[in-house]
Amino acid sequence: MGEDDIVELLWNGQVVRTSQPQRPSSGKPSPTPPILRGSGSGSGEENAPLPLPLLQPPRPLHHQNLFIREEEMSSWLHYSYTGVTSTPATHPQSSVSLPPPPPIAPSEDDVVELLWKSGQVVQSIQTQRPIPPPIFRGSGSGGGEETVLPLPPLHPSHQNIFIQEDEMASWLYHPLRQDYFSSGVASTSATRPQSSASLAPTPPPPSVPYGQIPVERRTENFMNFLRLRGNIFSGGRVEAGPVVIESTQIGSSATPSSSAAESCVIPATHGTESRAAAITGVSRTFAVPGLGRRGKEVATETAGTSYSGVNKAETERVQIQPERETKITEDKKREETIAEIQGTEEAHGSTSRKRSRAADMHNLSERRRRERINERMKTLQELLPRCRKTDKVSMLEDVIEYVKSLQLQIQMMSMGHGMMPPMMHEGNTQQFMPHMAMGMKGMNRPPPFVPFPGKTFPRPGHMAGVGPSYPALRYPFPDTQASDLSRVHVPSLHSNPVPNQPRFPAYINPYSQFVGLHQMQQPPLPLQGQPTSQPSFSHASTSK
């Protein structure tokens, strides 16, 4: 294998070796593997080298797989590290030894990688627990020098497993940790008195004074002073009193140890001061409230170098109002809110009152109108004969019929005087006729025309086609001259022969009609010395 070839040693219950050569080995001689020498106290073999496997690692290939099968690495790891971690029985004075293993043993799923690069072995531990590497100090009985073998820093599992060459130089000359290889690598017995290798004592943790909380150094959200300002305003009022150290939370952390800023309140009599101090890289603000009425200012300053990305709004000063002014402002805001609410309620109340008043006026006027209509309907019901209907529509229909019957009566009376032409009776008017005589007997009877047998009674032209035609009388009328018309008794229109009777000639009592007819049927006695002549009907036909 070449110098740049990579060899991986994996731990999965046992040691696994793999080698990935990139190209065949050239004719150059392979470098001699490093030799670990231990110092003994008695024998002359103190410079005897500890055997290591003669490996020729191939050139590294970053794009190939670095994990290989277990059976290819099991023999290599066991052969190479048995001489380092164990002392042969033939060398009892060997001073290279390991301390007893810790009680914590690796699980079967832990993975340990050993890489070979540029002639050196590189270890990469794939575990979740960061354990500080022990410091081995070896001392021989012949020499007084002590050599410290430092371990390279362990890298977490999420970082790159390839390390720089200068960090890998000291790893090969240091024995592997026995807690990771307790099952595959032999360990040194703890009963040997000649062993001089020991672990360096771990320094005790620094004591924390009582009443102080260690603050971790955090850089996230460090330059965002808008959150600091918001916490100052939301932290409540600032009171003057004894010195109290409060922690202001920045971000979402709620623990005091992870807070990124602390504020200290210092009492003062008057004036305004602002102090900023940087403690362990964390900005702490000291606010000095005064007793005056003007607002107090708090300045925030960053420790260390300035940051060019800080906005102007983040570095501007923040004003904090005193307690009295805060109360006055809150009272004013509360009063304004109450006044706005009351004004809104009054506006709504006035609108609702106006609407209710208009509705009341409308209801009152509607009630009055209905009362007047009911009164008029009652009056109409009293005027109609034998009307017992309560429905308004039915009452109005009866009123219409009644008015029509009255109009017909007026027309009939006018026709009797010759003032206006007759009109035809409607079919539904006859039901009101018998009940509306009004003292006129026989008004619903046909007109009193005297039938003359054998002849038709002539009628005026405007009466043609109206009503039935009556035949003429069989009995002749006496022949009267025009001069003798005064002798004929014609009832006067102004005379009232029968009391309580109407003065209309067309509407005469039937008894009077019968008497008149009987008188007309009696022929008059002929006068002596005058020839008898037939009565002329020309005058009778024309006279009425």
Curated annotation (Swiss-Prot):
Amino acid composition bias (Polar residues), ranges on this chain? 15-29
Provide the disulphide bond pattern. none
Q: Name one GO cellular component term.
A: nucleus
Q: Does the keyword Phosphoprotein apply?
A: yes
- Subcellular location as annotated: Nucleus
Instruction: Enumerate the residue ranges of region (Disordered).
Output: 12-59, 185-208, 342-364, 522-544
Biased composition (Low complexity) is annotated at 522-535
Q: Which residues form the bHLH domain?
A: 357-406
PROSITE patterns per UniProt: BHLH
Known InterPro entries for this protein?
Answer: bHLH_dom, HLH_DNA-bd_sf, PIF1-like_bHLH, PIF3-like
* Coiled-coil region list: none
- Highest taxon, organism lineage: Eukaryota
**This protein's UniProt keywords:** DNA-binding, Nucleus, Phosphoprotein, Transcription, Transcription regulation
Q: Give the Gene Ontology MF terms in alphabetical order.
A: DNA binding; DNA-binding transcription factor activity; protein dimerization activity
- The PTM Phosphothreonine maps to 269
> Mind telling me which Pfam families this protein's record contains?
HLH (PF00010)
- Subunit info? Homodimer.
List the protein's name.
Transcription factor bHLH119
Q: Tell me the organism.
A: Arabidopsis thaliana
Gene symbol of the encoding locus: BHLH119
